[in-house]
Design a protein with these regions (language model features):
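Short, well-formed alpha-helical segments that are part of the catalytic scaffolds
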Residues: 26-45
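Conserved donor nucleotide-binding strand/loop of the catalytic core
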Residues: 62-86, 90
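Acidic helix N-cap motif at the loop->helix transition within catalytic regions
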Residues: 33-36, 58-67
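A conserved acidic beta->alpha catalytic loop
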Residues: 41, 53-62, 76, 100
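Short beta-strand/loop segment that forms part of the nucleotide-sugar
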Residues: 47-55, 72
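Catalytic-site signature of metal-activated, phosphate-bearing donor transferases
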Residues: 82-88, 94, 99, 105-226, ...
Length: 359
């Protein structure tokens, strides 16, 4: 074992890898139930711990003091980026690890983290880690596991590339690691996030394409009638905004169609479903049409649209529309019609997809 370790150290020297130093940066508020769980799993992996508190009224700071004396207050301004930037500005080590209080790194992945820390190549500027357990606890994610940027080089070095007509490399060097971070939230943040989206759009902030997609997705997956109604004006503007992409127009129509169906505004409902069907149909709109006809007890027509949602179109916001939700709609409709054998076929398909993890 000692020999293997020595060989490993020699290999690291040969390839130019060095032990890096890491600043852990976190923004927190009222995290007394979970903060110690998070810090206990990551504190010894980092060389500096920076906690930025945005207004805790519980024991959050007291718990944080067990791990660091670098605790800073930040007046909350409904801007997560501003708070994280403030935390990053306090970091002094080579790399910055950004964590949330509802994250945990288990022992297997702590070992992977240590190896990464020992073997980091100096040119790497961002390390992505797998964010796991995302679809538990009523979250609004489409995938149970996905890569997220978590470790960042604090000071970037610019490098010239290409032998003639040389240019500076602008894209960061990103490493996709095998480290898995377990997400263990206490509750859903959807209501908080939707309120923030609404506040910023009302104040005139133009959502970039990524946030436009996330706002629409969170509304479809977790929004209620009130959330959808509050967002309606913003998404109507998106539909008519020539500067928005076709993808954003489709996203807006999905939100507006659902809002109209729930409010029984049929003129608006068919207006926005038609806009999608005349361009490029998607699973979300097919599910909305299925839900409408199911509500009208026209189960044959509803089944057609649920079938289209699963087998003839692709989802653009909510993957479940092209899987679980569409199949469940087919099962309900065929049972209502009295075709139990057909319903069983789709029930078996649903179970198969669940077992394969393809929903």
């Amino acid at each position: 074992m000692i020999l293997l370790y020595l060989l490993w150290k020699i290999l690291l020297v040969i390839v130019g890898a060095v032990m890096i130093t890491i600043s852990l940066c976190m923004i927190v508020k009222n995290e007394e139930k979970i903060l110690e769980r998070c810090l206990g799993s990551v504190a010894d992996l980092c060389d500096e711990i920076i906690i930025v508190d945005t207004g805790s009224t519980d024991r959050t700071k007291e718990i944080a003091r067990k791990y660091t004396d670098q605790i800073y207050d930040f007046v909350w301004i409904d801007d997560f980026s501003a708070a994280r930037n403030f935390a990053f500005s306090k970091a002094t080590r080579e790399y910055i690890y950004s964590a949330d209080a509802d994250e945990v790194i288990d022992e297997e992945n702590r070992q992977r983290f240590r190896l990464m820390k020992e073997a980091m190549l100096p040119e790497i500027e961002i390390v992505q880690m797998k964010y796991g357990n995302q679809m538990q606890y009523d979250t609004v994610y489409n995938y149970d596991e996905e890569y997220r940027p978590k470790l960042f080089k604090r000071l970037r070095e610019f490098v010239w590339t290409e032998p003639i007509h040389e240019t500076v490399r602008l894209d960061p060097v990103v490493y996709d690691s095998d480290i898995v971070i377990t997400h263990l939230p206490e509750s859903s943040h959807a209501k908080r996030d939707l309120a923030n989206f609404h506040k910023h759009t009302v104040n005139g902030y133009r959502l970039p394409k990524r946030l436009h997609n996330m706002y629409a997705r969170e509304l479809l997956m977790a929004g209620d009638n009130e959330d959808l109604a509050q967002a309606a004006e913003f998404f109507r503007d998106s539909v008519n905004d020539e500067a928005r992409s076709s993808d954003e127009m489709l996203e807006a129509c999905c939100v507006l169609a659902k809002s109209a169906r729930l409010n029984k505004d049929m003129a608006e409902f068919f207006k926005y479903t038609a806009k999608v069907l005349t361009t490029e149909a998607c699973s979300e709109i097919c599910c909305e049409l299925g839900a409408f006809y199911e509500g009208e007890r026209d189960f044959e027509e509803a089944a057609i649209w649920y079938y289209n949602a699963v087998y003839e179109t692709q989802p653009i916001l909510q993957l479940a529309c092209g899987g679980e939700l569409g199949l469940e709609g087919l099962i309900r409709c065929y049972r209502a019609i009295g075709l139990s054998r057909q319903a069983d076929i789709y029930r078996q398909e649903l179970e198969r997809r669940k077992q394969e993890g393809s929903l």
